[in-house]
Amino acid sequence: MQLEKAKETKQDMERCRLLAQRIAEELAPATAAVLNAETPALEKALHRAGVDANPFTVAARQADLLVVEDPAWAEMPAQLPGQVLLVFTGSNVAEGWAEELARRGYYRDFRWRSRGRAQQAALY
C-alpha cells in the first residue's frame, strides 16, 4: 500500500513538474494562483520553474495566471486574472467553466495543446 502511494506521489510530482515547466516556458507569468489543488505539488513545481505561485485567495486575485486543478470540482471565483488554465486531473469535464468563461469574455486559446505525458489542459 505504501509503495503504491509513493509511486502515485512520484507520478504526481513528475506531472506537476512537466506542467510547470511548460507554463513557465510558454506563458511566462510572473505570478500564478492555484485553485483547487489537493496537494502543494503544482505550486512547488511552479516555484522551481521560476513562477511566483500561491494558493488562490482574495489577495492572489492580482496574479497573471489562474491555474485550476480539476475544474469539475471547483467553483469559479468572481474575479479572474488575465489568463485561466484549466488542468484536468480526473476527468476532462469542465462543468460549465467554458460557458461561464465565454460569458466573461475569455476564449480558448487553441494554440495551447496538451502534449505527450503532460496532462490535459485548456488555456483561456
Language-model-derived ranges and their functions:
Residues 105-117:
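Conserved S-adenosyl-L-methionine
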Residues 52-63:
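Short acidic low-complexity segments
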Residues 39-51:
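Conserved SAM-binding loop of SAM-dependent methyltransferases across substrates and taxa
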Residues 82-92:
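Conserved beta-strand signature within the Rossmann-like core of class I S-adenosyl-L-methionine
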Residues 28-40:
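Conserved class I S-adenosyl-L-methionine
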Residues 1-11:
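Class I SAM-dependent transferase core
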Residues 9-31:
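Conserved alpha-helix/loop element of class I SAM-dependent methyltransferases that forms part
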Residues 71-79, 93:
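A short, conserved alpha-helix within the catalytic core of class I
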